[in-house]
């Protein structure tokens, strides 16, 4: 923009210089005689009217026809000197990217100004051709001016007038062409600028002449005005189809050729009268200069703003270029890093793939091991299920047998009780009968004595058998204790499946032994009951025999009878003690069975834990179970000691009751001892109370005396 504005300023300065020169020349020419007459005055009047109306915009069709006519005339005329003037052409904008936008901008055109002939001719012909083409909304101006004069004075006047008249148009051309002038064409030569100003003045005069001609031809050819208006609208907005414009131009070439010739003839007449219009041109030049100066100031201000914008844009461009370089460096660095990351990722992926393959292989091996362990576990589980079923069956059978035995024992005990009650009633009845038969019993004393001796011997045997049974019961108790100790040891120590099976078999054998001992005790009890029945029968017979004896014998028999009843009661107590011991043994047996079940459950749990551990750690050794803590062991030993103490107390109480039952003197002495102890304790309590009642007030008085000063 700055270069364009500089070019515009240079053009305006040249215009000012030429205007001053023209003014001086006009003042000189006015003193010289005017060759032209009334025709020049008429042309001057017409030119004044045209200047007031302003320049006329020609249609593209007229321009085409004029160019054709001009070419014909050029071919007829002799060769002339041509001065080519480069006009300002706006360069396409930087932001445009399409072909239409670049095509829409006006191009630089050259105007050929034909110089004057050195020989000079009788007549000068002036030929003005104005081409204004519309290339997709863009205006391309090609102006070619040919001037031929016969007289040197007329030629100079025409050039001066044309230069003064076209100063306004040169300003417009500078305005339109200034924004797009490239930097290479910023400083043209002074001679070219002068030629350009002269051509611009000629163009303005010719435009005014063309406007007059166009006004005359408006009525004849209204289509030309319509085409001019359409051309203006086309210049403001781009046309979509360039082919349609070319067709219109070709159509209008023929119609406008004739009109162009007429207009050119009128323009020649007007140019002859240009000299007379110098004074009006001076005023117009003054106005043009004022407008140009104002526009120059505006252009300068705009130039400053545009320079500032240009500086800013350059700074932005430099910053953008630096940023682009930085971005390119970053891009290169990122590409290098990306390549490094890709190589690292490839290495990592290869390593990961190798690890995954190794893991897959190990997973397959572990799956195979897991399948084998599952098969083993299924087989072991089937074995365990079979063992559990067998165990449950044996347990149910044992429990059912024990229940049946208990039911039979209870039935027998009830029967014995019923029989005992019946015997008691029978004994009472028999006592009454014995009183009646006491006399008869005296005769059978010898028999009774013999029977008594035999019964005493049998009683001794029975006592011996009872002692043996007690020993057996003690041995059974010891065995049960040993079984409990074994169970505890089994709880403390981890046992394997083979040891557990052996222990289960041993426990089953011990249970069978206990059952056999219980059965033997029951058989012995039944034998004792049979012997008691026999003795009862014998006693009944003896009572029958004793009825025949005397009273003394009856008394002796009563004593013997009482002794036998005592023995019977003693045997009954023994039976009851045996039944209680049997119940205790059954309770212990149930306890041992429960402990056995608990041991089995713990063994199964330990097996499951071992299997789960062996599934994950096949190479690890089986760890031994840790023993119970110290306080648990102390509690277990304390429980054993308490059980032993309770058993000792029970056995002592049983023996004491037996002793007191057998010895009534001991019972009486125990009674007297208890009474004496109670009385002695009561006496002691009474004495202590009296002593406390006596010592209380004396102690209180002593304390009161001690408090005094």
From Swiss-Prot:
It comes from the Eukaryota. Residues 29-43, 94-113, 162-180 have a biased composition (Low complexity). The keyword Translocase does not apply. Keywords: Coiled coil, Golgi apparatus, Membrane, Signal-anchor, Transmembrane, Transmembrane helix. InterPro entries: Golgin_subfamily_A_member_5. Residues 685-707 are lumenal. Its main location: Golgi. May be involved in maintaining Golgi structure and in intra-Golgi transport. Residues 78-89, 114-132, 211-222, 248-265 have a biased composition (Basic and acidic residues). GO terms for cellular component: Golgi cisterna; Golgi membrane. Residues 24-132, 144-195, 211-265 are annotated as: Disordered. It is found in: Golgi apparatus membrane. It is a single-pass type II membrane protein. The chain crosses the membrane at residues 665-684. Residues 287-592 form a coiled coil. This is Golgin-84. GO terms for biological process: Golgi organization; retrograde transport, vesicle recycling within Golgi. Residues 1-664 are cytoplasmic. Pfam families: Golgin_A5.
